[in-house]
């Protein structure tokens, strides 16, 4: 797809739906529309409008959508910045750490491990609770921490707030890797600094989008298909491929008989400790272990920048189903997660609940990056091929005795 074609789609209203005959073209349209909606943080106005848009896509695929609410104490950053040597650097607070008041925190700056009041650390996306940074947060040695985010490309790449409901440690302000050299020099100098991570909280209702496709025997354990739909930025390649495959699977499964029901959920709350999928499970006691299986369309499916594919599965049979289907579609399995390992993403709730699951998570140089947007971020043909893979796996699980 050319940039001109992409921009032509992006110039349309964010929630207009256009149905193309070719799946790759439909995929590109879906991802462009999703990106064009704005920043997809859980519980935001964009998140709610995107849920309505996705529900319309479910109806277009021939199913009846539901919007299932769950409670959220939404964090709205009001002032998040770090001032040092006359420069003010904006950032994003870590959402599962403490915050500051309006006055912020002042003190001497130093490298992590040094004698200082505010420390400088660094972390790749989603590793803020691990390593030296995680240790520093747990010991509360410092009044506050500045974290240089190290993604696959330069920029601000926040970590998810896995402990959103049980925050810990001092305030942490995440900043772009492009500020790294200046901040490291300032820390070595022991500069006087000021950090503010002021937020407001607002009680709201976020929503999951769900649907159910009836099979021949509703008494059989269902297949559950899940994909997250929220994130820190516009998330074109992070979330777009999974959402497109989720909709395409509905469209394909609607055309043929199935032995059992298929339940679909696109969950919000991904970046906040998977709040949405946990709410979905809580509304359905026992669904994790009583289901025939779960399919998880994780992050970065069909991402074009430094791509790769990680397979996660509960058992050998499910892994073989997915790996064989990927091989048949010409898609490489870059990495297989060892059996028994706690999987990444929403598949974690199934693993911990003793359910059966199969999952794909992609690699992506733009993961959690503000620059995750535009036609160069995705490969629609690869996403379309994953659509073939997921149809094959879903039909296998939904049609056999398990």
What residues fall within each predicted segment?
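His/Asp/Glu-rich mid-to-C-terminal helical/loop segments that flank catalytic regions of hydrolases
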Residues: 251, 366-402
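Noncatalytic luminal/extracellular "stalk/propeptide" segments of secretory-pathway proteins
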Residues: 32-131
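N-terminal capping segment at the start of a domain
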Residues: 19-45, 61, 70, 81, ...
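Soluble metallo-hydrolase cores and metallopeptidase-like ectodomains found primarily
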Residues: 87, 91, 96-109, 158-237, ...
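Second-shell loop/turn segments in exported
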Residues: 19-20, 37-45, 124, 168-170, ...
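Catalytic-core environment of secreted peptidases
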Residues: 23-46, 54-62, 83, 121-126, ...
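N-terminal export signals
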Residues: 3-21
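Metal-dependent peptidase/peptidase-like ectodomains
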Residues: 218, 257-258, 267-365
């Amino acid at each position: 797809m050319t940039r001109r074609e992409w921009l032509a789609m992006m110039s349309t209203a964010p929630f207009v739906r256009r149905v193309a005959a070719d799946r790759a073209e439909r995929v590109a349209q879906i991802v462009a529309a999703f990106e064009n909606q704005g920043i997809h943080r859980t519980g935001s106005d964009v998140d709610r409008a995107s849920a309505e848009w996705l529900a319309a896509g479910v109806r277009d695929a021939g199913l009846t959508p539901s919007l299932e609410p769950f409670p959220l104490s939404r964090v709205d950053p009001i002032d998040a910045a770090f001032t040092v040597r006359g420069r003010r650097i904006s950032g994003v607070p870590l959402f599962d750490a403490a915050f500051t008041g309006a006055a912020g925190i002042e003190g001497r700056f130093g490298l992590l491990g040094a004698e200082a009041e505010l420390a400088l650390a660094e972390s790749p996306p989603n590793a803020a609770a691990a390593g030296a940074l995680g240790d520093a947060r747990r010991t509360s040695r410092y009044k506050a921490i500045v974290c240089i985010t190290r993604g696959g490309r330069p920029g601000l790449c926040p970590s998810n707030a896995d402990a959103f409901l049980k925050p810990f440690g001092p305030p942490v302000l995440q900043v772009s890797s492009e500020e790294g050299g200046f901040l490291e020099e300032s820390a070595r100098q022991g500069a006087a600094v000021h950090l503010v991570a002021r937020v407001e909280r607002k009680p709201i209702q976020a929503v999951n989008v769900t649907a159910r496709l009836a099979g021949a025997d509703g008494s059989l354990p269902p297949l559950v298909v899940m994909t997250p739909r929220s994130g820190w930025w516009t998330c074109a390649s992070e979330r777009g491929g999974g959402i497109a495959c989720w909709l395409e699977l509905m469209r394909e499964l609607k055309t043929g008989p199935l032995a059992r029901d298929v339940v679909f959920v696109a969950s919000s709350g991904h970046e906040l400790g998977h709040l949405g999928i946990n709410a979905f499970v809580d509304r359905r006691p026992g669904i994790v272990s009583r289901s025939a299986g779960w399919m998880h369309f994780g992050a970065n499916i069909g991402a074009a920048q430094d791509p790769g594919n990680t397979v996660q599965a509960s058992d050998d049979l499910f892994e073989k189903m997915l790996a064989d289907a990927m091989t048949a579609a010409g898609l490489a399995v870059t990495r297989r997660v060892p059996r028994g390992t706690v999987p990444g993403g929403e598949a974690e709730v199934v693993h911990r609940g003793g359910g059966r699951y199969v999952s794909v998570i992609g690699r992506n140089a733009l993961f959690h990056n503000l620059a995750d947007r535009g036609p160069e971020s995705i490969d629609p043909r690869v996403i379309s091929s994953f659509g073939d893979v997921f149809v094959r796996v879903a039909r296998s699980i939904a049609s056999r005795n398990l």
